[in-house]
């Protein structure tokens, strides 16, 4: 099995924008809202998601460490667009508190995926365990062709 990380450029099901400067050390040429220097916030905002297809379903797994299930939303738009979003809110600073270091990131993420036609969006299930969100989109049963026997005469 190959674990090649694919670009979304030619993926017809991905609705992510392509950044031609992604991966370069000097940052994004598209004026990203999350500069490379703040890689923790960028990692959270980008929410890495794996999408695999099994014979029965399409399975999405998203790393959302530190988020509660109430802070994550899974929705279907227009009947065939899976939307996964979440937000980690910055901890309230009390006037009496003295902060020595703030390293945990806060921010929002939003990812959309166009689902293939052979899915059942009305039966989507989602669960969270150990900081990993799993979304399962069942597939329709393959349609068996109607076979009609033709009687041979003569």
Swiss-Prot record:
Domain sHSP span(s) in chain numbering: 40-154
Subcellular location per the Swiss-Prot or TrEMBL entry: Cytoplasm
GO cellular component: cytoplasm
Domain of life: Eukaryota
GO MF, one example: unfolded protein binding
Stored SUPFAM superfamilies: HSP20-like chaperones
Disulfide bonds: none
Induction context: By heat shock, arsenic, azetidine-2-carboxylate, cadmium, copper, ethanol and hydrogen peroxide.
GO annotation, biological process: protein complex oligomerization; protein folding; response to arsenic-containing substance; response to cadmium ion; response to copper ion; response to ethanol; response to heat; response to hydrogen peroxide
InterPro entries: A-crystallin/Hsp20_dom, CS_dom, HSP20-like_chaperone, Small_HSP
A Pfam match: HSP20
Chief location of this protein within or outside the cell: cytoplasm
Keywords: Cytoplasm, Stress response
PANTHER family: HEAT-SHOCK PROTEIN 20 FAMILY MEMBER (PTHR11527)
Entry similarity comment: Belongs to the small heat shock protein (HSP20) family.
Description of how the protein assembles with itself and partners: May form oligomeric structures.
Identification of the protein by name: 17.4 kDa class I heat shock protein
Species of origin: Oryza sativa subsp. japonica (Rice)
């Amino acid at each position: 099995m190959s674990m090649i990380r694919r670009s979304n450029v030619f993926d017809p099901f991905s609705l992510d924008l392509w950044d031609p400067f992604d991966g370069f050390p000097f940052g994004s040429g598209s004026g990203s809202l999350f500069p490379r220097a703040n890689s923790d916030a960028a990692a959270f905002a980008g929410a890495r998601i794996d999408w695999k297809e099994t014979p029965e379903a399409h399975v999405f797994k998203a790393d959302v460490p530190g988020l509660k299930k109430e802070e994550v939303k899974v929705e279907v738009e227009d009947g065939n667009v899976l939307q996964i979003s979440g937000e980690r809110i910055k901890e309230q600073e009390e006037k009496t508190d003295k902060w020595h270091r703030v390293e945990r990131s806060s921010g929002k993420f939003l990812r959309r995926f166009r689902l293939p036609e052979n899915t059942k969006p009305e039966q989507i299930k989602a669960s969270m365990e150990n900081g990993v969100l799993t979304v399962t989109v069942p597939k329709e049963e393959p349609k068996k062709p109607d076979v009609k026997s033709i009687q041979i005469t003569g």
